[in-house]
């Protein structure tokens, strides 16, 4: 019987697939995501679903926004999926399938869920496997696409969903509060990093364009 993969195995697989260095503010997020997905997938109650896929893709895209060089971002996502033994194309396709609900009112979604036969991928909100923060992120990303501003009063929206989906809504609320707080922090760190890079660029430009200093001693009479 083959021993289950460990967190260390998953990390090694990732760094074997992506050998280029990763900027420090992003590396911590990637390693935390690697661990989170690994621990979820080795759980016997884990069930892959389009909701999980949307959560993974959304979390990655939002936290890795602005990563340079841009081409490395896709390579990092591919390496992450390889390390977790997931199909990156399937994740992206399943995440994109939620776009069919863009602009729909929440009331219509509630009606479909109440019907007992929601269409795919909406039916993955009837999640009965192991819950994780990534399911909450996927739900939040889905709600952001609906008509109106249902995420402004997020807790009220989640309370409306509570009777018709089996997700642990109170955990979802706490996880999303922490998720949005962490996203704000990394956005602030990104902004600061951009400012520092721009300041350094201007400083170097000024040094390059400045005229050479004149040695006053050379003009002194002999």
Swiss-Prot record:
Pfam families (alphabetical):
ThylakoidFormat (PF11264)
Stretches that traverse the bilayer: none
Give me the Gene Ontology terms describing cellular component.
plasma membrane-derived thylakoid photosystem II
Q: Name one GO biological process term.
A: photosystem II assembly
Q: What does this protein do?
A: May be involved in photosynthetic membrane biogenesis.
Record family assignment: Belongs to the THF1 family.
Q: Cite the HAMAP family for this sequence.
A: Thf1
Under what name is this protein listed? Protein Thf1
């Amino acid at each position: 019987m083959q021993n289950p993969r460990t967190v260390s195995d998953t990390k090694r697989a990732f760094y074997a697939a992506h050998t280029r260095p990763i900027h420090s503010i992003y590396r911590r997020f990637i390693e935390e995501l690697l661990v989170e997905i690994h621990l979820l997938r080795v759980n016997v109650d884990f069930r892959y679903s389009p909701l999980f896929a949307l959560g993974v893709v959304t979390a990655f895209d939002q936290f890795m926004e602005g990563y340079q060089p841009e081409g490395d971002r896709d390579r990092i996502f591919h390496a992450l999926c390889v390390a977790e033994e997931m199909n990156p194309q399937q994740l992206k396709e399943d995440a994109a399938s939620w776009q069919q609900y863009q602009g729909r009112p929440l009331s219509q979604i509630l009606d479909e869920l109440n019907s007992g036969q929601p269409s795919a991928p909406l039916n993955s909100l009837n999640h009965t496997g192991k819950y994780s923060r990534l399911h909450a992120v996927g739900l939040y990303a889905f709600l952001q696409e609906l008509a109106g501003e249902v995420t402004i009063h997020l807790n009220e929206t989640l309370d409306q969903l509570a009777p018709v989906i089996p997700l642990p809504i109170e955990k979802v609320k706490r996880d999303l509060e922490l998720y949005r707080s962490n996203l704000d922090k990394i956005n602030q760190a990104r902004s600061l990093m951009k400012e520092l890079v721009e300041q350094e660029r201007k400083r170097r430009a000024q040094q390059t364009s400045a005229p050479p200093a004149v040695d006053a001693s050379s003009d002194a009479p002999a």
